[in-house]
Design a protein with these regions (language model features):
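Flexible glycine/proline-rich, aromatic-decorated loop/lid segments
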Residues: 48-51, 276-312
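A glycine-rich, hydrophobic/aromatic-adjacent loop/helix-cap motif
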Residues: 129-234, 305, 339, 380-385, ...
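Long, contiguous, secondary-structure-rich segments that constitute the structural scaffold
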Residues: 318-320, 324-372, 435, 440-455, ...
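Long, well-ordered, tryptophan-enriched scaffold segments
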Residues: 39-43, 48-132
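A short helix->loop->beta-strand "cap" motif at the edges of active sites that frequently abuts
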Residues: 35-41, 266-270
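Long, low-complexity segments enriched in small/aliphatic residues
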Residues: 176, 183-192, 213-214, 348-444
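Glycine-rich oxoanion-binding loops at beta->alpha junctions
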Residues: 1-14, 222-233
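N-terminal leader/propeptide and maturation segments of large enzyme subunits in energy/redox metabolism
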Residues: 83-119, 196-221, 315-387, 424, ...
Length: 539
């Protein structure tokens, strides 16, 4: 996030796209509601009329995968009506003319056909965002989990730059991470193409720097990008990968095209899993290493708004469980790599982070333990207060200017067809979390949300002979599953919604990837649906 979560309370207009934070990030919702009570305009772009949309002033009910067309059309209106921030553009950006040429092709009339959002709502959203003194954009995985995800994020940044809505309180482009400490994991280099602090592995100077820090020969560090998890399962199929260590992940439930994932993990020569539960994935493992829960470990965590905080354990690890870092260091020692993993404490790990990650250089364990609310990176020195708001004095370019990059509408990987005429999209519900490894073990939560369901519009339900409480079968090119029907006006005709917290849902999703970020397209799959008779239900 360019701005802290708490700073959302200072916004005069908030455009939410691809996020249902009322259910999925309820703490974020608190600060947004503070802004609303102060008179801010809340606009929500989502295929479903979610709990977040319910609270909005302007609801933009777009079809799944049409986000770029909506954003480009909003910018079209802003350019046509000259609502952009000319002074900011001239002083702080490049690429304005190219952007204007691109968005010229997205008048509200055309965008309405591509997105399903009315011309009037597009124009109202554009004026509200551009005219507000401080406007913020908030997005989540409803934006990124598409083959067009990277391009959509660029469009969000273009919109913010166009109106000068960045670098000030209440403004910015603010992605919400999908789970606890994902920001911290990425900051630490848990990505296939960067070292900690997003330092590229292709840069020889970076490889030399980290080889020295880790006490290893520089030629052991590859300049080539590694694989994402989806790409790893494909590599197993090609016999290019023979062993895997999975930490705190349940890909058999959580990854797209999960039947294919299961086939790969059943085929691999060796599988080790580090987890606190016997997940569906752990059941396939050759070795299971019991991890400590959050209450049994200590160390730093980084939240979605770059806020680094210190966590102390509540109890000692139970049984044979250990914190993840101790397990990894133990494995490294057995593999003859002890010199590269010579950590004795969590504080010592953070000391190394400070040495190799410039954005963390001023963040010590001692400072965190004595700082209520944490410290926002970048924090380059011990006496630096941290940086809650980014880009207050320009951008990270040689000329200090933000670059506007026009993007075009990109079709989803799997369009509908006569055989698969409906669009399936997936997401979360308030009572469960990710693959359900934790929440499906809670009797109280299961009592309220016990099973998979299919949300469907009344018009589509009538067309296919479906009623609330009935059982239906949903089929895609990758598999079929049965679930209970919930007829609802909260979803548009032609679209089905299913939560992904249950073991079978991702049998249906497609593992097509965004070509840049290599994130799979969970949010769009072509499908069909049919009611099941009594005999089929009994079976």
């Amino acid at each position: 996030m360019t701005n802290p979560i708490t700073d959302l309370a200072n916004s005069d207009c908030i455009l939410v796209i691809g996020s249902n934070f009322a259910e999925n990030h309820p703490i974020v919702a608190r600060w947004v509601m503070d802004a609303r009570q102060r008179g801010a305009t809340l606009m929500v772009a989502d295929p479903r009329y979610t709990a977040t949309a319910w609270a909005s002033d302007i609801f933009l009910p777009l079809m799944p995968g049409s986000d770029i067309s909506l954003l480009n059309s909003i910018m079209h209106v802003i350019v046509k009506e000259k609502l952009y921030n000319r002074q900011f553009l001239e002083a702080h950006t490049t690429g304005f003319d190219d952007l204007c040429s691109a968005v010229e092709n997205y008048p509200p009339g055309r965008a309405a056909k591509l997105t399903g959002v009315s011309e009037d709502k597009i124009a109202r959203a554009a004026r509200a965002y551009a005219n507000a003194p401080a406007s913020s954009i908030v997005y989540c995985m409803g934006v990124t989990q598409h083959v067009s995800g990277t391009q959509t994020v660029i469009a969000c940044a273009d919109l913010a730059l166009l109106c000068g809505q960045v670098g000030r309180p209440g403004t910015g482009v603010n992605p919400l991470r999908g789970q606890d400490n994902v920001q911290g994991a990425c900051d630490m280099g848990a990505l296939p193409n960067v070292y900690p602090a997003y330092q590229s592995i292709s840069d020889p100077a970076n490889r030399s720097k980290f080889a020295a820090a880790w006490n290893i020969p520089v030629d052991t560090l590859s300049p080539n990008s590694g694989l994402t998890l989806v790409e790893m399962t494909h590599a197993i199929e090609r016999n290019e990968m023979h062993g895997m260590l999975i930490m705190g992940e349940n890909p058999i439930v959580g990854d797209p095209n999960s039947n294919r994932v299961r086939g790969s993990l059943e085929k691999i020569d060796f599988l080790a899993v580090i987890d606190i539960f016997m997940t569906e994935t752990a059941q396939l493992a050759d070795v299971i290493l019991p991890a400590a829960s959050f209450a049994e470990r200590r160390g730093s965590k980084t939240t979605t708004d770059r806020r680094v905080q210190w966590l102390e354990r509540a109890i000692q690890p139970i049984g044979e469980s250990h914190p993840d870092w101790q397990i990894v260091c133990g494995l490294a020692g057995r593999l003859g790599l002890r010199d590269a993993f010579n950590y004795d404490t969590e504080d010592g790990i953070l000391d190394e982070i400070r040495r190799v990650a410039p954005s963390y250089a001023g963040i010590s364990a001692g400072r965190l333990q004595n700082t209520i609310g944490g410290i926002h990176w970048p924090c380059p020195t011990d006496d630096h207060p941290g940086t809650p708001i980014l880009y207050t004095n320009g951008f990270n370019k040689v000329d200090g200017r933000g670059v506007m990059k026009p993007v075009e509408h990109i079709e989803s990987a799997e369009p509908t067809s006569p055989e698969y005429p409906l669009v399936l999209t997936s997401g979360r519900v308030v009572l469960h979390y990710n693959s359900g490894s934790m929440t499906r073990r809670s009797p109280a939560l299961l009592k309220r949300e016990p099973e998979m369901f299919i949300q469907i519009n009344p018009e589509t339900a009538r067309e296919y002979g479906l009623v609330t409480g009935g059982l239906a079968q949903v089929t895609t090119r990758r598999g079929s599953l049965q679930a209970v029907v919930r007829v609802s006006l909260r979803i548009p005709p032609g679209v089905l919604f299913m939560p992904y917290h249950f073991p079978t849902m991702n049998q249906l999703t497609i593992d097509a990837l965004d070509p840049t970020a290599r994130i799979p397209e969970y949010k769009v799959a072509a499908c069909r649906i049919e009611p099941l008779g009594e005999k089929e239900r009994a079976a």
